[in-house]
Amino acid sequence: MAKKTKAEDPKKRIITLRKEIGRHNDLYYKENAPVITDKEFDILVKELQKLESENPDLADVSSPTAQVGSDLSPQFSKFKHKVPVLSLENTYNETELSEWLEKTGIEENYSLEWKIDGASILLYYEKGKLTNCVTRGSGGIGDVVTENVKTISTIPHTLSEEMNLTVRGEIFMTFADFEEFNEEYGGKFANPRNLAAGSIKQKDPLDVAKRPLRIYVYDVYFSSSRKGINTHKDILSLLKKEKFPLAPDTTILTGKKLLREIESFRKKKDKMPFPVDGLVIKLDSLNLRESLGETSHSPRWARAFKFDALLKESTIEEIDFAIGRTGKVTPRAKVTPISLAGTTVTYATLHNQDYINQLGAGIGAKVLISKRGEIIPAVEKVTFPPKTIFVLPNQCPSCNTKLTKVDDSVDFFCTNRHCPERKLNQLIFFCSKKQMNIEGLGERQIQIFFEKGWVKDIPDLYTLEKYKPTLLELDGFGEKSVKIIFDAIEKSKEKDFRFTLPSIGLNEVGPKVTEILIENGYDSWDKLLTLSKSKTANEDLKAIHGIGPRTIEALLTHLKDKETLKLVATLKKLGLKFQADETEKSDLQPFVGQSWCVTGSFENFQPRDLAMDLITKHGGKKVTSVSSKTTHLLYGPGAGSKLDKATELGVKLVTESEFLDLLKQEGIAID
């Protein structure tokens, strides 16, 4: 989590929190791999909300407090939701909930229902026919996954009347179905929530149909008149009449009775056949809902009551360490196996030495284990102390290098760049889907090649074929799988600077920094090398919006580092591209001499970079920030500070409809 330092400047803390919350949103919604609990996440959000309210001059519509997390994926077509799909504000105790009920109306009726831990989905019906199934996405725009969702047999494809409405539900998997499916596939999936969320994003509906997905629906948005539907109870009756599957135990009761009923739900939680992480409480009256309205992030008429993470006792048997690709050392406890949230837990994270000291943890200690967000096992509390508190060794367990702390970090690092475990994790990172995407080279395969000495560093991947005869003799490496690996390695050479630079794992140089460098003319390794030799390198980089002092220092250090220079030179000789591919140019060049920036969301350009691609293809220049040199700003709903700055500077403002008219006038077709 983003750790607060004493007397930290509010502006710096706000920036830190926004970045940290954005990272955790991506891990949860896009990667299905959260690393903190929901409660820890909400603590960060509440701190940011407080700071933003105390410092209104630092408000920003792009702040995560003004948006919902996004699960948008580039491979799916996009759909603009007819009503914003908001998230719920969370509460973790009865006192907070009681205060909200008093404010909203303690005597009013509320619905109380399970909060299922799955994947949110919206079912769009036009004239009674199911036309689109769409993920929540960013809240304004979602991914169209219609054919995948239609494989769930309990979803009605036709309603009894020609109604136009949107049904919201949650796609999930029961614990029993998950265990059976996961066993069949070698235990490769972490939990039901991840598998359900990943399943609806599969490319082939036939693959989705093999997965035991289920759905419960819980709300309806009406396109026009509600036709006598005045309460949530009426909505549930309509859904039941149309034969939609509804979650068990949903009840309507007054605010006073609701507080008493929560305890009975809490007792049932661990016996539920599907994953739940809390309760949803909503005002029953739709008219009252409309009068209360919503914020940009959540409705004022609903709350999520989140259960604290499930805890179980176990004993620490051993403590070992993971060494990441950056050298960060993470201790983890091997514990007596326990069953927790439907899975067997044998390891739990201990984070760092400071955390171990705070807990008083060590070998032999009895501890409480939680599954963070019911996903990440962690040691939460010591219930019976060990003989001695565990102390990290002074030396790296992989290479015996002395461990050190970097700057003010609470973590220890192995600084040996040739540490075997660091090298192994660098290789895994390089081959991963988000980096060079070398199919067939997962963690297991890379570890085998690494242990055999075939692949010790990134360049060795591109000479691996010399071991092909021996490789084919290994169990699990047939002709077909080996061909996939070598084809993928060769195909990775087609990736340009946008991928090669961030994939080699240079500290502070990720995809975003790489894109900013390219946009500002540093579109190759050679140009960066030339820059590094300039006396004005520091000043030139400082002039680029989006690149801070820490990144500048790291980048210039990398560009003078002998090992980094040797690595890139070797990879270039092996055929990898360290220059950005030129954007395809058209004979039509109406945007020559123009610099365009983009902000907001768009109906016809999803993602919005598609609009910028058209501009660069037809002679224009794309910029990431508004300045006096910017000639045009293309803006849509949700435009923030860029629109204000462009207005102040007199930059020409262009709406989506105006942009479409301009393209039409110039004879430019949208691909």
Curated annotation (Swiss-Prot):
Its EC number is 6.5.1.2. Its cofactor is Mg(2+); Mn(2+). It catalyses: NAD(+) + (deoxyribonucleotide)n-3'-hydroxyl + 5'-phospho-(deoxyribonucleotide)m = (deoxyribonucleotide)n+m + AMP + beta-nicotinamide D-nucleotide. Residues 586-671 form the BRCT domain. The keyword Magnesium applies. DNA ligase that catalyzes the formation of phosphodiester linkages between 5'-phosphoryl and 3'-hydroxyl groups in double-stranded DNA using NAD as a coenzyme and as the energy source for the reaction. It is essential for DNA replication and repair of damaged DNA. Belongs to the NAD-dependent DNA ligase family. LigA subfamily. NCBIfam families: dnlj, PRK07956.1. This is DNA ligase. The lineage of its organism: Bacteria, Pseudomonadati, Spirochaetota, Spirochaetia, Leptospirales.
